[in-house]
Amino acid sequence: MATIDKHSYAHMFGPTVGDRVRLADTDLWLEVEKDYTQYGEEVKFGGGKVIRDGMGQSQASCFDTVDLVITNALIVDHWGIIKADVGIKEGRIAIIGKAGNPDIQDNIDIEIGPGTEVIAGEGKILTAGGIDAHIHFICPQQIEEAQMSGVTTMIGGGTGPATGTNATTCTSGPWNIHKMLQATNDFAMNFGFLGKGNTSLPLALEEQIEAGVCGLKLHEDWGTTPASIDNCLAVAERYDVQVAIHTDTLNEAGFVEDTMAAFKGRTIHTYHTEGAGGGHSPDIIRACGEPNVLPSSTNPTRPYTVNTIDEHLDMLMVCHHLDPSIPEDVAFADSRIRKESIAAEDIMHDLGAISMIASDSQAMGRVGEMITRTWQTANKMKQQRGPLAPDTERNDNFRIKRYIAKYTINPAISHGISHEVGSIEVGKLADLVLWKPAFFGIKPAMILKSGFIAAAPMGDANASIPTPQPVYYRPMFGSFGSAAAKTSMTFLSQAAIDQGVPEKIGMTRMVGVCKNTRNIGKKDMIHNNWQPKIEVDAQTYEVRADGELLTCEPATELPLTQRYCLF
């Protein structure tokens, strides 16, 4: 039997079981847990390679074969870290397993035929597209910026650089909702819009849900009172949509206890739950211990560094229309920025008490850095806290699964779209991102929407090959013409679909329904469901979880920074 040495095998077909891979310049290492490809029967495309007529490619028609196969990919998802071929059919993940030609090979799950395109996944990491569930839709240019970072779904609200949108993630009222649905029709990105949830009577909320939002947003700048919270959640319960909340920093209408009492045990997504992005000062972070609260962070505080505190004050003044010449406005800003709770936030992510990370795009957060800052946080915690049980010094598989869940499956579950997106699982949209390991978390190698290439780094279009400089991120064919709409989905409430909103306003893209948002809780946040009792000292701002003080030093240096961003 012919053999090949480990180094040559990894170079040719990618890593296999027991091999370890470093994630970019971090201290995080993954180890391959399982390999679905068969040694000696691997498929690979190229001159003199396997995927040729009568060899790895069968004679079968498109009815029996996949449209696209990603060969020898290293899948990193919440459910595992495995090596496999991935077959994609009609825009969805059809099979994860072994690809080839069943006429001459045994145990073939994915049949390759003349109608099958190939993407070489050997030596690359494959992840689900990121889901950013805290978007201020301030400018359309955010969409391309997010896409090029590996994000394929954006959930939030807004209408452009309006004063309300600069501060709050709300698309307010049916007319604005319809305009945003129309404006985003032709982008290669999935969308979900949040209506304004701040009112104490139901009618204005019902009409927004029926107009096409996938959820509602309560924001303190519109008045997040106990009455509006109760009303908003009551309407959401009837329509099966999610509610996101930015609570009352100034404690004008009540304290954190009053807000949590107004929840009445109903499910809610708490934005920037640490508090620097807004929320009851100084103890909104206590919400992380509640069984009905789905907590998230936004990326300006991710991770805690020596620069975090200084940069926040100016950001806050701009985003919330505050005046630095008014002492009360300055005091408002100062009350939100607490190094003690930001330090605790790092540790709460590492222990799974905070379930999600999002951007807060152009409203204190950076839309193209959600994924990067997630892995910077994971790396900081590895350096400061060591392996995360059950991990050992050999690999960080559990920590990697915990952190990738924060921007993929958990926001999908929270907003009722996990049946369509959020993980690499059969039946879901093939919204996928390929990464070279050396660039993982910061520079994707390729972004696919429904199995069609939407964006990638590309060299000089007049060159003789694809790679000559200047190489930079460019939209690909999946971002043009009607293909962008036909490979992308907008998530609406079932009520809006029943009202015929897509047809009435001329939407031509795929439409998905958000569902199962009211019967979930913290327990459903994969790898991130710890519910400690959180206590905050009102004088020192120290944070304790189940009696243990949560604190850490700010980072002075981070991975995934300057060495990747010279141009």
UniProtKB/Swiss-Prot annotation:
InterPro entries: Amidohydro-rel, Metal-dep_hydrolase_composite, Metal_Hydrolase, Urease_alpha_N_dom, Urease_alpha_subunit, Urease_AS, Urease_asu, Urease_asu_c. It is found in: Cytoplasm. GO terms for biological process: urea catabolic process. Carboxylation allows a single lysine to coordinate two nickel ions. Pathway: Nitrogen metabolism; urea degradation; CO(2) and NH(3) from urea (urease route): step 1/1. SUPFAM superfamilies: Composite domain of metallo-dependent hydrolases, Metallo-dependent hydrolases. GO terms for molecular function: nickel cation binding; urease activity. Its cofactor is Ni cation. The active site is at H320 (proton donor). It catalyses: urea + 2 H2O + H(+) = hydrogencarbonate + 2 NH4(+). This is Urease subunit alpha. The gene is ureC.
